[in-house]
């Protein structure tokens, strides 16, 4: 790759950098060289991530070379000085060099690259793989939910349950994957030169039968660059657990427009009355174990840690009872709005139960011991896992992290907000039914019928989180994003010294972007999505007509962003009732942003595939949602974006009210903080800027930006838009009549298609990967958890297949990445003949050749159906079946029921979902997940479920179709079971 000298450092860049990229890299290198901090804004599509990685790692590589030369010189000098004792001198010189080599690369800083989501981190790692620095040591830290490969853990619902199950197995030394980490961590496949993202770690872990989650931690110490989400970086406990050392480190905070909120959240905490009540019950439970074991054999087991006494438990229980009494006594006069108290009130509340700065560390240590004790004790019962103790420990750690010498700062930066919690009696009953609570003592039981409280300790000063980071003695902090402006208030709120700052222009020219404010719809109804107008049916209809007209002009992908989910749902319902939904769908298939992670994955797959259709597709999403924050809609995936309104935070939300009040109270001319109103408006505009940034993704991209809200004409709103967007709107932006906009938009796309080089689609990669990696021809099972019918009046309903292991769909940057042909059919858009199956798609392995002969196609009388099934399993052998045709009489079955299992994966799943109930389908998905990584036991479980769910004659065709999903070693047994079932019913 070409080498460029930037700020005196050789930087390898994939091409000759543009001026904006060179300016950006120069600022980065100056920060690293001088050990200072920087706040750098560069619009989405200017190559920000690539510039950031190349400049940072270019400086690191130069520093490594300098250190290596210094080390060689030192070794040479020492050997020269010790020539009098040649043998000893050489040995000592080698020893010193070895020690130096282990000491954190002897002064070479490590790079910590943090972003908001794993989706963004994966995109960054993909950029790194394309650079000359792809051979540098890199690791990504992920959660158990993403990295764990233990089938028992992955069967658990919810991240907290997975964490607890993992901890139980690790503590009991029963996780074979974790036990292999020590012996496999130096394996060439794991320590190889290639950069491994989440997906790569999982694949290597499965191949080596080694835990990817714990193995990734082993790479941190030797990595040149470590990728992680914000919470891993800002949470001291997470840093310790993941062995993250920040001293002399370079910290990069990418997508930093969220950093203020994340810093505030990292210093905030919540406790409920029910949390304390459960903690009391848990302590009582442990005390009972202690009491019963004093007169008999230890009932809890000899391996449980007992480095605490019954006196410790008694004292803790007394404190918890007092804390429960104090929390329940908090006065909340207005149940709807709650009650707000100064920060000191939290310390008074805890002080009533004798929780103080002085004993905080001791109590937290005791709580950690109790959690470990309960985890071991609950291995068999799985009733108590110490979750309440963890909540209490978090509360104490966060509240008492603020030392007494900064209490004046705490008092103006924090507030206590109390709310009413639902009846503790109902919660207690629910918990008791699941075995979570014991009977407890009389005091706890007597308070169970009282109304509980939720106590929030909210931080409104993001400087607290940044101060913790700076106190670790990092070398440099680089905060960067496409939407940081205005920079001065941001820097003031974060309270960090900033030596370098930058606001870059965009690299695209005027002919590549069309930006317009649409103040009225085709019917001349004003488009304004304020609170008063959102229920106006004329406005909603006009907005739908606007989207319909735009969908007729925009080629390929159209993105439509709404201010909130309620507004999106309201519009969808109204358009379905009026027929507008069907009209838009006839132009472009519509995809809605789902709120669940699993559904989101499959929806994005379907959207990317639909883009290949000549009509393209329309994706309706929400500002601040996953689509607006983390996804890339380059080229055909997003040719236009419609912003339907300004996504202001809820005006009456207590946290919003208190944040505005905090800014007004603490704002001075010197600190340049925003006013409460300015912050409120900026929150909406930053979300808009993020949504707009999904479209223009690179130098040769083009697209239209349509702001469909009359309020965008206000000068205050325009000034908060990204600088490059303001340049396209002009000095005095005004909305234009709808007719001219339609003509201009049509002309814009016509000109762009003629003058701008269209992207060349690369060969696609298979979406789904195999489970059985030993043999290429072995069958694979992707997890199937839920299929959801999208709302709509058209006859082409869309189905969403959720896939927990297909998280890489969130990372799809373009249609170049995805080509599963069955998604088009799943959406009901193509009724064409099926194409040849993709051998890498597990559903395409439905390769048992089946022929059906209907001897009575023209009548409704008794039908005879002949099946000839050629077994695909090389291990299958049954002389009784051989090549002999099997005849089966099917009495009085309607013509519509004579059918085979659908060939395509999506159609098959749609068929299954349509004929069984939701509980059966949920069990079906779980059984497939278990079978995916399990052995004979999991096959037996799956087989029993299939016979139960699909054993009826009318569903037998689905049971036959399921054979195609099985691993080769289980097909023979499946055939025997199926033959027995059919013989019994003849």
Swiss-Prot record:
UniProt entry keywords in alphabetical sequence: 4Fe-4S, ATP-binding, DNA damage, DNA repair, DNA-binding, Helicase, Hydrolase, Iron, Iron-sulfur, Isomerase, Metal-binding, Nucleotide-binding, Nucleus, Phosphoprotein
DNA damage keyword on record: yes
Localization in the cell: Nucleus
One GO term (biological process): regulation of double-strand break repair via homologous recombination
EC numbers on record: 5.6.2.-
Record: residues binding ATP: 42-49
Binding site for [4Fe-4S] cluster: 148, 166, 175, 211
Segments forming domain Helicase ATP-binding: 7-326
Listed GO MF terms: 4 iron, 4 sulfur cluster binding; ATP binding; ATP hydrolysis activity; chromatin binding; DNA binding; DNA helicase activity; DNA polymerase binding; metal ion binding
GO cellular component, one term: nucleus
Motif stretch (DEAH box): 254-257
Positions bearing Phosphothreonine: 875
Catalytic activity entry: ATP + H2O = ADP + phosphate + H(+)
Signal sequence coordinates: none
UniProt-listed InterPro entries: ATP-dep_Helicase_C, DinG/Rad3-like, Helic_SF1/SF2_ATP-bd_DinG/Rad3, Helicase-like_DEXD_c2, HHD_RTEL1, P-loop_NTPase, RAD3-like_helicase_DEAD, Rad3/Chl1-like
Gene3D superfamilies: 1.20.1160.20, P-loop containing nucleotide triphosphate hydrolases (3.40.50.300)
Role, per record: A probable ATP-dependent DNA helicase implicated in DNA repair and the maintenance of genomic stability. Acts as an anti-recombinase to counteract toxic recombination and limit crossover during meiosis. Regulates meiotic recombination and crossover homeostasis by physically dissociating strand invasion events and thereby promotes noncrossover repair by meiotic synthesis dependent strand annealing (SDSA) as well as disassembly of D loop recombination intermediates.
Family indicated by similarity: Belongs to the helicase family. RAD3/XPD subfamily.
Designated name of the protein: Regulator of telomere elongation helicase 1 homolog
Organism: Drosophila grimshawi
């Amino acid at each position: 790759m070409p080498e460029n000298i930037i700020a005196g450092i050789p930087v390898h860049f994939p091409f000759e950098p543009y001026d904006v990229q060179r300016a950006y890299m120069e600022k980065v290198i100056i920060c690293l060289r001088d050990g200072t901090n920087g706040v750098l804004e560069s619009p989405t599509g200017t190559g920000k991530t690539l510039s950031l990685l190349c400049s940072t790692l270019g400086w690191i590589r130069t520093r490594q070379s300098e250190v290596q030369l210094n080390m060689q010189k030192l070794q040479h000098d020492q050997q020269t000085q010790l020539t009098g004792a040649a043998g000893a001198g050489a040995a000592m010189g080698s020893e010193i060099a070895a020690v130096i080599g282990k000491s954190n690369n002897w002064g070479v800083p490590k790079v910590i690259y943090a972003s908001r989501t794993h989706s963004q981190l994966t995109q960054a790692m993909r950029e790194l793989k394309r650079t000359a620095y792809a051979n540098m040591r890199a690791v990504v830290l992920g959660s158990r939910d993403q990295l764990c490969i233990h089938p028992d853990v992955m069967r658990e619902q919810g991240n907290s349950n997975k964490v607890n199950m993992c901890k139980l197995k690790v503590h009991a030394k029963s996780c074979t994957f974790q036990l292999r980490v020590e012996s496999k961590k130096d394996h060439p496949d794991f320590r190889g030169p290639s950069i491994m993202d989440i997906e790569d770690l999982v694949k290597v872990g499965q191949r080596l039968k080694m835990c990817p989650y714990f193995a990734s931690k082993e790479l941190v110490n030797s990595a040149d660059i470590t990728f992680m989400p914000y919470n891993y970086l800002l949470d001291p406990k997470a840093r310790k657990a993941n062995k993250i050392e920040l001293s002399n480190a370079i910290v990069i905070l990418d997508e930093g427009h969220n950093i203020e909120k994340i810093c505030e959240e990292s210093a905030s905490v919540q406790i409920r009355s029910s949390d304390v009540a459960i903690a009391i019950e848990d302590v009582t439970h442990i005390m009972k174990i202690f009491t019963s074991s004093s007169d008999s054999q230890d009932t809890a087991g000899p391996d449980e840690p007992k480095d605490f006494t019954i006196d410790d438990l008694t004292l803790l229980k007394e404190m918890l009872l007092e804390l429960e009494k104090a929390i329940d006594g908090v006065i909340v006069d207005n149940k709807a709005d709650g009650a707000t108290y100064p920060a000191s009130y939290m310390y008074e509340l805890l002080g009533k139960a004798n929780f103080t700065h002085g004993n905080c560390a001791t109590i937290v240590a005791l709580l950690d011991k109790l959690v470990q004790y309960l985890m071991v004790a609950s291995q068999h019962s799985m009733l108590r896992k110490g979750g309440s103790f963890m909540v209490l420990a978090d509360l104490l750690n966060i509240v008492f992290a603020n030392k007494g010498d900064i209490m004046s700062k705490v008092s103006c930066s924090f507030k206590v907000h109390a709310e009413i919690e639902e009846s503790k009696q109902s919660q207690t009953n629910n918990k008791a039914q699941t075995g979570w609570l014991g009977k407890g003592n009389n005091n706890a039981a007597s308070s169970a019928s009282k109304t509980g409280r939720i106590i929030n300790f909210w931080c409104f000063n993001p400087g607290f989180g940044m101060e913790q980071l700076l106190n670790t003695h990092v070398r440099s902090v680089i905060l960067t994003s496409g939407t940081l402006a205005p920079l001065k208030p941001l820097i003031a709120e974060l309270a960090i010294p900033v030596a370098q700052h930058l606001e870059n222009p965009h690299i695209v020219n005027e002919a590549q972007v069309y930006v317009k404010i649409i103040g009225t719809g085709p019917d001349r109804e004003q488009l304004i999505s304020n609170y008063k107008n959102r229920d106006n049916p004329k406005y909603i209809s006009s907005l739908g007509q606007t989207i319909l007209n735009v969908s007729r002009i925009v080629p390929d992908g159209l993105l439509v962003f709404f201010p909130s989910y309620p507004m999106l749902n309201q519009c969808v319902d109204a358009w379905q009732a009026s027929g507008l939904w069907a009209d838009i769908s006839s132009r472009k298939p519509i995809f809605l942003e789902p709120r669940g992670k699993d559904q989101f994955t499959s929806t994005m797959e379907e959207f990317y595939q639909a883009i290949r259709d000549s009509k393209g597709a329309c994706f309706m999403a929400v500002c601040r949602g996953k689509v607006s924050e983390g996804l890339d809609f380059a080229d055909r995936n997003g040719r236009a974006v419609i912003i339907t309104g300004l996504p202001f935070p809820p005006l009456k939300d207590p946290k919003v009210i208190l944040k505005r009040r905090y800014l007004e109270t603490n704002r001075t001319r010197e600190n340049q903080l925003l006013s409460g109103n300015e912050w409120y408006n900026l929150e909406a505009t930053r979300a808009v800027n993020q949504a707009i940034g999904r479209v223009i993704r690179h130098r040769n991209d083009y697209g239209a930006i349509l702001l469909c809200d009359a309020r965008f004409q206000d000068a205050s709103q325009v000034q908060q838009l990204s600088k490059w967007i303001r340049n396209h709107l002009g000095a005095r932006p005004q909305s234009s009549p709808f007719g001219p906009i339609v003509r201009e938009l049509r002309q814009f796309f016509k000109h762009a298609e003629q003058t701008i080089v269209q992207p060349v689609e690369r060969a696609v990669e298979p979406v789904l990967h195999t489970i059985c990696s030993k043999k290429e021809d072995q069958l694979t099972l992707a997890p199937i958890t839920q299929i959801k019918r999208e709302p709509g009046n058209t006859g082409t309903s869309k189905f969403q297949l959720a896939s927990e292991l297909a998280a890489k769909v969130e990372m799809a940057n373009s249609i170049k990445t995805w080509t599963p042909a069955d998604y088009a059919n799943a959406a009901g858009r193509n009724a064409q003949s099926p194409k040849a199956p993709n051998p890498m798609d597990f559903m395409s392995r439905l390769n048992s050749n089946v022929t059906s002969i209907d001897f009575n196609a023209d009548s409704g009388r008794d039908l005879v159906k002949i099946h000839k099934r050629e077994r695909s399993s090389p291990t299958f052998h049954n002389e009784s079946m051989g090549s002999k045709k099997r005849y089966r009489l099917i009495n009085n079955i309607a013509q519509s029921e004579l059918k085979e299992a659908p060939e395509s994966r999506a159609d098959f799943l749609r068929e299954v979902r349509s004929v069984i109930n939701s509980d059966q389908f949920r069990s079906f998905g779980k059984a497939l997940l278990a079978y995916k990584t399990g052995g004979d036991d999991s096959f037996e479980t799956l087989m029993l479920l299939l016979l139960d769910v699909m054993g009826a004659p009318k569903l037998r065709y689905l049971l036959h179709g399921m054979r195609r999903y099985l691993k080769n070693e289980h097909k023979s047994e499946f055939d025997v079971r199926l033959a027995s079932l059919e013989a019994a019913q003849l």
